[in-house]
Amino acid sequence: MEMDDEEEEEEEEDSRRRNGKQASCELCRRDKVRCDHALPVCNRCKARGVSSQCFYHPAPLTRPKGRRIFPLAEGVSFDRARSTGPSESNTPVAADHVSPSRHKPLLPGYLGPTSFVSSLTDDMDLSPDSQGLEVETGQRVLPPYWVQKISEVLLALGDFSTIEELIREYYELSQSAVIASPFIFNSLASVKAICKERIASRDFDDFTSSLTVRIIQNTAETFVIPLTTQGADFHTLFTGPRTRLEIIGVICSLAGRACYFWLAQKKFDSQISRSQFTRKMLAASDAALQTCKILTPLNDLTIWLVHENLLLSHVANGVSSPHVWSRLGELSTDIFALGLHREPKGSTEIPGFMLESRRRQFAAAYQLDKNLATFLGRPPRIPWRYSDCRMPLDISDEALVADGLSLDSPQDGIVDSMGWNINGLFQRSSWLRVRFIISTFRDEILEISLQGMAPSTVRLLEDISNRCHSAWESLPIHLRYNPQSWDNSLPAAVCLMPIFSYLAYLCNDFLIQRLLAEKNNPRGNAALLSVSSDILSTVLRLGTQREHRVDLRQDFTLTILLYGFPSASILIKALQHHKRSGEPFLYEGSRSALIRNLSVFIAHLEAFSHPDNVSYALFQRASQAFSKIIDEILEPGSVAPDTEFEEVSLFDYDQMIDMDGLDWFSTMDFGVAFNQWLF
């Protein structure tokens, strides 16, 4: 009873102005009517049916000098003492002062089997939800700078019809989206309602101000997913009256990336407007993420936001951007801190649909980590040797929100004992599984390549290669690529995913064969030249495809950079060495067909070598270098063996294809080619 009295006294004190009088809610104050000062919502606002707009401003009469750009200039109080449940109210109550903080231990999140508490519990895989992940209680104040940033994020939602069209079209066409579509679509409806309410408000600035306060208070609450939550109701925990900043940041990230891929074509007049929109969405996503790090403990929504922000930054800033690598570090840290890398043992307090969503999130982050580590020649951030997370089941997005579906039982007639769907369907989870399997072998290859060659390396690499081939052959037949995979009766994304998966699979073999070849052997070996030729022909086959609804140029550009350059470099250097030295050419296929493919590849490079292309400098240098070498190869006259390779190349190809660090492009000007990806 004494504690209840103390809490009531503190709450009553928080609702008073500095002059000792009780504060009125903003609606009563503006209408100049008597307020009963009830918390969290006054009875007058309840009677009028405007409870959602009832809030107590910390400094209602404070106004910045000059033009009022952002209505909240004093900072906003937020209380991190409670956990939000489905039945709890999140109506914000702001205070005039900061009450003394009462501290609780800050628990570190997931604690594994070697942690300091492992000997005290039978459950080694401690659930982050059971630990609470609580932080200091009592009221704190979010600085005005971040309050203004949240207002800017909300203003970025101004043209919500464009955002909604971009996201819906992205999910309609994409086979690589990670977050299940029902979670996003249900959230869109709620955020759209907020935007409509703001437009219809009598005072736009005041509504934005009250909405900002409400979102700050909601986001500051510890995000808890009750075990009884159903997938169809999951969005209600972070939308509507409980709208959180994380989901707004996710929506901005998805819209920015969809815009980059030229979706919602009628909404944009030019490439410049698309670039500006993508940059605006990235700025909003960055601001949302940084503010969430201040306001709330780590949760699943935070990981959604970090991942989507990383993907948007990847296309906006370029794959070699320091920002991308830094964000990947954040994502891996958060995944380990929340325990997504470990499969729960025994009973868990996490709903089944959320466990499956976490498996999808981990699989997507794992393969993205391997791609970036390969491209940049750096150690991966999420090594498999410390993880045992199961692959996601090959089920539809809609299955996650279906009633009565057991996601852990393969006997339900949907998936087989290996987790693959039994109906031969193309689903987003199918490609997550395929790319995850390929990435586990890439993980092993990276570990060997970054450690350096040893006497036992050959045996290890051959074993990895054999297991990788066996894994590919064991995939469901409809998910494996063949030259006839491109079927006009199927959506473009369904046709693209087998090509991308096949290229990732071939890249594993390419890396292995390059490591097995002698370091400075310009001839390569038959296996290396063969896989390089397969990669090049697959890249060129992608270049022949056309799709009226999707601009494939962005995908083709990235494919050339990631796969075309390395394979073409190996082949053209081997041809040049054969021309100069007269030694046998180890390629077992048709030499003339290979030269034709290289000529077509050079033609693609030249086609991208125009000032309007963001990678203009890179493609121009590459086309010039490759063209000179092809001219030398086709020239009937002989060339002295001692002629320096650098005389006809703008790249140092010996370094370029030196796979010790898997750094194919160490001599290229990434500042021009990638860091300004959209400009």
Language model region names:
Residues M1-R257, A264-F268, I272, Q290, ...:
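Intrinsic, low-complexity transcriptional activation domains
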Residues M3, D14-G20, A95-D96, P100-G109, ...:
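Intrinsically disordered, low-complexity transcriptional activation domains
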Residues V98-P105, V135-G138, L142, H235, ...:
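Non-transmembrane, amphipathic alpha-helical segments
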Residues N218-Q230, Q276-W304, R327-G346, A364, ...:
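Long, amphipathic alpha-helical regulatory blocks in the mid-to-C-terminal portion
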Residues L254-Y260, L310-H314, N371, L511, ...:
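Tandem amphipathic alpha-helical repeat scaffolds
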Residues W262-F277, H314-L328, N520-G524:
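Short coil/turn connectors between adjacent alpha-helices in alpha-solenoid helical repeat scaffolds
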Residues L310-A402, T440, H577:
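Acidic/serine-rich, low-complexity amphipathic helices located in mid- to C-terminal regulatory regions
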Residues R378-C389, E398-S449:
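Extended catalytic-interface subdomain
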